Amino acid sequence: EMCIRDRAQLTAFTQTLAQCRELPEDFIEDMIMKAPSPDIMNKLARCVLALYSYDEQPDDISIENVLRQSIQLVAQLPTIMSYAYQVKRRHYYHKSMYIHPIRKEHTTAQFILNSIRSDRKFTDEEAKLLDLCLMLHAEHGGGNNSTFSTRVLTSSGTDTYSAIAAGIGSLKGPRHGGANIKVTQMLDCMEQEISDLTDEGQVADFLKRIIHKQAGDHSGLIYGMGHAVYTLSDPRAVLLKEQARKFASGTEFEEKFRSIELVERLTPEIFAREKGNKKRVCANVDLYSGLVYRMLGIPVDLFTPLFAVARMAGWAAHRMEELISGGRIIRPAYKSVSLPGVYTPITQRTEAQPHSSVYVPTEERI
């Protein structure tokens, strides 16, 4: 059983992460600064794959070695993310780039706040809030897209760096890790289109227009509401909402928090009325995480990369579990929905008789 049993072990583990935070010599210059990326998620994946070349035992998939690799990646991913963001600031936004020295006494949350802020200052409350965000995003079962991707690659016997890079690539997708950005964009759109963010009628009308694809990104989706697993409530959202309320109270973010509360309260009844669907709809973690990040001064560029930094621990745990108990390669079955077709040699094909199989409509499938 691998677990941290007391504060002494926690301190030792925190110190281990701090000692592993540094990247290999010249890695920052060669892998991060020389090839700026418009999306930091791609830079994370590229750098993780590059770290394979710096490992003396990259293909050793013994649990001991994978644990070593995983701890190093848990420690180094925040470093890569922070430096990649600074390089993006300089290259794409033409702003100053800050590369601060790593302080070994910092926790992961403290390191991130220290490295992305020009003055390096943060409060204990800010670090605790970011730490909570990282913990809430660290693990969410093996069925989510990025973790399943990691397990699929692990089952093939590939190396740790390839498996984790696949997870990062999956998480980049707007239907997965990019969902909190979609929430932020939706709320920004609402702020532009209505005059009072705390007016229940105006917010309700905006949500109704979203459902009918007349507002937002015209997808018909109210981002931050609903979950594939949770129906009554998302416990992560409950915790973040409580903390967001405390941090927003008496600040410029209080009105935004109240508007998000309205979205959470009004969406189920509007959804039921407009769609005739009685399914329970609850807020998910993405509804409040974007506001929390903004209150911490974290730029949108880092919303999804922060998710990856947090989920690295979960990916590592699932990879080791798959190595220990999997045994077989994961190969989902796919059933063809077309009728058999006769192969026609290319020299005998005509426009009137192309080589093609016949598609079977969903309602006619057996």
Where are these regions (language model features)?
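Non-transmembrane, aqueous-exposed alpha-helical and coiled segments at domain scale
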Residues: 5-366
